[in-house]
């Protein structure tokens, strides 16, 4: 395999992984589980300090297996029942009595949550004590990237700053572009990318769960009912919207099923996966074609998002759906140029959508961006593309750089304002 392709696969392996529950509160649960594993008995108290952006994305989302919302329950149940070896699936095996004990710890005033000033967008510091022992766990630069652990004031683990790999810089030093991603996805050995089919399996199960049960705003179930009631047609576009939104409903509603995440986001993993899976079904594509399309979608999304900070004020589902549209064109037999048209079309459509935290209404944003992907795909296969106007440039790479500039230089104050509004 080419060195460049090996780098691409390493990127995918690093940030396309199963995650149970919204990754921001799960980050706190993971840190707490590690802290608890360092103690000889169950923690008596837990304090959590997080970055503004991690705080924002934890305020309104259900923690799986608990039926409850927020960082406090995530940290408490992580400390009492979390599996420190399970990464983003830290809460996969929690039980009802552990949730009750976690809530009792909160009710007793032994769990605290606060914001802390830091340059890192993804940052979580947990302090736990039991008896005479006090432990701390610090996560920085990635949802599971532990950079320091202490026991009774002594450092027992530390990762040098120069050795840390922040997800924000995951494409740094890599020869990567939309053209390179397209070539990799269409030419690499199927056996080297077969693993991405797990995304189809996990996120399809999550969609089925969201359609079968009541989660969040029930966006997917509402589309399903509207189709059955004759208000909407059962067609290619609406079925994609229904299944994609339903998975997000379940994800945000605390379903105890993992999503295959993308770049730290389960919703974006859903948006990168299900429109592609549904398109593959429509065109009766085999597993190899589906895998190639999923690689195109997931890696394309990662590449575009690497141009701006994670957990910013910009809703990442927008650019994720742009990459999904690119992959949909591929499955329809379109050309590379038409795939680029699809990206341009999405970028011109809904690239102004803001992130105001993870919550049940994310399912509506997933539906919106996915709808944009479907429209962009339909235009692109007719060789229709947005022209060089506004933030959309003559070529797709220039447009992607423009998006990065918009978010990095133009939306910092937006992010601060959103967090201030949410915290008021």
From Swiss-Prot:
GO terms for biological process: L-cysteine catabolic process to pyruvate. This is UPF0597 protein Ssed_2537. It comes from Shewanella sediminis (strain HAW-EB3). GO terms for molecular function: L-cysteine desulfhydrase activity. Pfam families: SDH_alpha. Belongs to the UPF0597 family.
